[in-house]
């Protein structure tokens, strides 16, 4: 599916997003609009409008008609709009950074272990497709061998947390799988939704590659999507040595098992209810709920420390885990072995040899409508930014966003907070007790503008020349270890969840904070 979205509509969308998260966040966004560092299209350009169209008849055509007529979606993209166009502009700077650092590494002009060296080394490994061709699927061979050796479902379940960690590599989109495991559920650190001063463990449903509706739907689209998926899995399994008949049989087994998982999964609309999805309990109670899953072992495999029976876990979907436990017991071991083989391969395809990458892109064409694969340099620049985001971001803001602009933005946000405080205190319909609560929340409101005051320390991240797969695995494990180390402690409210070049903004209700990366503080959104 491809989509055209003009600057005019995207600007409106951004304001809606801001208002949904926080009225103050939207006001802040508008206030910093004067801080854009470079020229770009106007937020509202009348030349994009088709004024021959009556706005009350077709407002979309009225607002964007001429823009839609004058723009086409590039063959390497699924959509086109202001977010993506500004993102491309930001990514050009990222590409320059990673290429420059790779040249420094090549010429021996940067010291090993520095951020520049790690950026350049990671990027160079991603660009080194010759090494990937020689390796084939050898990087995941040890993982596949462990699955092949399993004799029982117990053997499979015991390794749910280990599969994808020991040698688990890069995700299908270029992001690291290392550290995530390949279980049909997700367990990881999360700020306690009812106590934002501590990080606990959250357990959630998972294990699906398609949308739940694609597995269960009876319509033409869902039926076709399942057929396309079976073809993709079949072709992929053939690449790791299965015969065409074996691969086809395994692909159907995998679809059937994932469909069973989809049936017991809670619909996403229901998963949005914060009250219905809060079930905090000690690990011992969670273990009783899932006797066929060694959850304590899983946590330890994932990197959790000091795991005891009292370890706090928020089980977001108890009914799912109860049903999953029964499904695990009832499903033959060979079905689980096929499932894990496929998920191990799928998680690593972007980091393996050409046939794997080409099949991954063919599937992307089927699901997104993209016609041409992005240039390798663009893919690797994005992957490097994903792996070393704040190291890249530190250089990005040096080139593209001044400290003075950040200071002015922060000052404007402070002024808006003061204005909102005055407005709250002046409301005649609000009780004094409520005003005290509202001002208290406002005073605790954390504003993150442009980029972090303190950059992430990558000194313990061991990037090495050579294998792109290994580097993605190391990044995934490093991030996982950092996250698990926070359990039982207060969340680090100074840490950002987005990198400086990101074209986005967010509000966290649990942490009461906004983020406006420098990447979005530019035209056409802010001028």
Question: Where do the protein language model's features map onto the residues?
Answer:
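Short, solvent-exposed loop/turn elements at domain surfaces
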Residues: 67-71, 210-211, 524
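Short N-terminal segments immediately surrounding and downstream of signal-peptide cleavage
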Residues: 38-54
